[in-house]
């Protein structure tokens, strides 16, 4: 969705950098990166890091695929090392098989219901059991994709004959290798799920773990249905939707939009007639892109109800703050678009008979190869006027004194910290302009107050920074002078991004101390540099109230060095 020159300039900039630096470039319109990677690049047994939290989509093909901050990925691409703390391993043991109109989306919604959005932090989710072989690669990828909403490091399925058949259909059979757990594998935790017992589910506003059965939520009126995203935009999902819509008409009170996940999916839909069935039914076909999932278009009406096959339903993420967003499967979405109300798709009766092709259309003409080493130096990197320098910081001072510039509660997402949407995303290369939107969902005065103060602390609750891996949620607070974020607990990727930005992440040793601090209190971290380097206890002094609170920090020696150096950029310059 390009309403000005900014996105076009960004695309041109990235394209020129990729060409110069030896990187393949998937051009705009080729599809959502996770869907394209699954189809054309993913290999079982390989490790993948990507600067998007839904990189674990690759776990559906047997990859160790992890979301990370952009700086972490850039350092790894430049020859550095990517570090993670060894996670615990959770075995989700699947038995049985999905019943008609029950989908892979319902599997991960059930896992979210059990584990919650905090339950996967510091864990890898491994799927095992006889039920695994009943799931296709796209279905597995749907499940691993939304493992991000658990806060998990990643999720992974074995690589088996189902994986081999998928790769063969993509013309990549030589990329297959078997991957399975050892017979004597030991897990930290086991969750049992019988696929045969699952029913159509929905996550209610405004959190992916607020899960109920569709039949228990009831027949609420629906204003909008959006089908697509990196979670549910595969050919299999699209064929199911087309079959449900075939010969029918979308309810007059419903706006239905559909975004196939890749050019390959769109091509095949066009050739087999599925696209025509969608259009004839009244669907609005969107570009193969993230689109409405990140708030780029298709915002619901005021106080509207929108069913989406997406992965997140955070407050305001859709672009309409008072809209009610429900996360559902493509089957629930398509049937509800016809009825105009939330509908259990099992009411259709006869099961869908979807035949997947034995081979996919392979056309990689939208993947641009880099220049040869001989020609790389001749490639000019193209900048636009909206592309501004990366914010930097100085080394950590011995002590820090500043106000609690903002106090927020539990489950603050990176969408709260740095919102997305059509109004804001075009400025992601312009941190000074972007900064005016920081925390606007929570407090529209934050950016102005932070600029006026020049420095400050943020006080947060539990699971601070969950959701997207967007490093702008750390870079913009850095630009606004935030020196430390003090919380009950952090989400993994955001905590790493804060460290990379040179912002100190600290936790209350006693969670009750959170309640003792008010926004505007004058706070101090005395001798913080020495304490961090010497692994000493850190105390937060509340100058306003005359109190002290013990704080904790979970930092490796490398992370301490990064913080003290003023962030990963400074650290990398000095050490690589």
Placement of each model-derived feature along the sequence:
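Fe-S-dependent hydro-lyases/dehydratases of central metabolism
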Residues: 1-576
């Amino acid at each position: 969705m390009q309403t000005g020159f900014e996105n076009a300039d960004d695309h041109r900039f990235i394209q020129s950098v990729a060409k110069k630096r030896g990187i393949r470039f998937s051009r705009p319109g080729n599809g959502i990166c996770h869907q394209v990677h699954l189809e054309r690049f993913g290999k079982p047994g390989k490790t993948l890091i990507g600067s998007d939290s839904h990189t674990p989509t690759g776990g559906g093909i047997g990859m160790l695929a992890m979301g990370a901050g952009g700086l972490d990925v850039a350092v790894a691409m430049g020859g550095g090392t990517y570090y993670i703390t060894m996670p615990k391993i959770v075995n989700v043991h699947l038995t049985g098989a999905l019943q008609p109109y029950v989908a892979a989306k319902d599997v991960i919604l059930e896992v979210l219901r059990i584990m919650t959005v905090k339950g996967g932090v510091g864990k890898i989710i491994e799927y095992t059991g006889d039920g695994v072989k009943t799931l296709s690669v796209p279905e597995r990828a749907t499940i691993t994709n939304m493992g991000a909403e658990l806060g998990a490091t990643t999720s992974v399925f074995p690589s088996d004959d189902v994986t081999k058949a998928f790769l063969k259909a993509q013309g990549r059979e030589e990329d297959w290798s078997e991957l399975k757990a050892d017979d004597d594998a030991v897990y930290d935790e086991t969750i049992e799920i019988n696929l045969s017992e699952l029913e159509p589910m929905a996550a209610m506003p405004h959190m992916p773990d607020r899960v109920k059965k569709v039949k228990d939520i009831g027949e609420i009126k629906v204003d909008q249905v959006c089908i697509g995203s990196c979670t549910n935009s595969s050919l299999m999902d699209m064929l199911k939707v087309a079959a449900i819509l075939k010969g029918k008409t979308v309810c007059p009170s419903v706006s239905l939009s559909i975004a196939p996940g890749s050019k390959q999916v769109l091509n095949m839909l066009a050739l087999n007639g599925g696209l025509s069935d969608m259009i004839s039914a009244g669907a609005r076909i969107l570009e193969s892109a993230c689109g409405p999932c990140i708030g780029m278009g298709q915002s619901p009406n005021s106080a509207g109800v929108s069913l989406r096959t997406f992965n997140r339903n955070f407050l305001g993420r859709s672009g309409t703050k008072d809209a009610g967003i429900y996360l559902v499967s493509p089957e629930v979405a398509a049937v509800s678009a016809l009825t105009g109300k939330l509908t259990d798709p099992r009411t259709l009766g006869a099961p869908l008979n979807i035949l997947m092709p034995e081979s996919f259309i392979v056309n990689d003409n939208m993947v641009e190869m880099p220049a040869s080493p001989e020609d790389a130096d001749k490639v000019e990197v193209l900048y636009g006027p909206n592309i501004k320098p990366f914010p930097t910081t100085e080394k950590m001072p011995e002590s820090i004194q500043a106000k609690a510039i903002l106090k927020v509660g539990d489950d603050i997402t990176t969408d709260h910290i740095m919102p997305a949407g059509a109004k804001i995303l075009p400025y992601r290369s312009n941190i000074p302009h972007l900064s005016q939107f920081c925390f606007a969902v929570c407090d529209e005065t934050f950016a102005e107050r932070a600029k006026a103060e020049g420095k400050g602390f943020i006080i947060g609750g539990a699971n601070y920074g969950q959701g997207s891996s967007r490093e702008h949620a750390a870079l913009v607070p850095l630009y606004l002078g935030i020196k430390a974020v003090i919380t009950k607990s952090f989400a993994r990727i955001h905590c790493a991004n804060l460290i990379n930005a040179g912002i100190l992440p600290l936790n209350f040793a006693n969670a009750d101390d959170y309640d003792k601090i008010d926004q505007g209190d004058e706070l101090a971290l005395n001798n913080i540099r020495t304490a961090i380097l010497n692994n000493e206890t850190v105390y937060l002094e509340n100058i306003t109230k005359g109190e002290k609170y013990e704080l904790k920090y979970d930092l490796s020696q490398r992370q301490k060095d990064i913080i003290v150096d003023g962030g990963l950029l400074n650290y990398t310059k000095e050490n690589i």
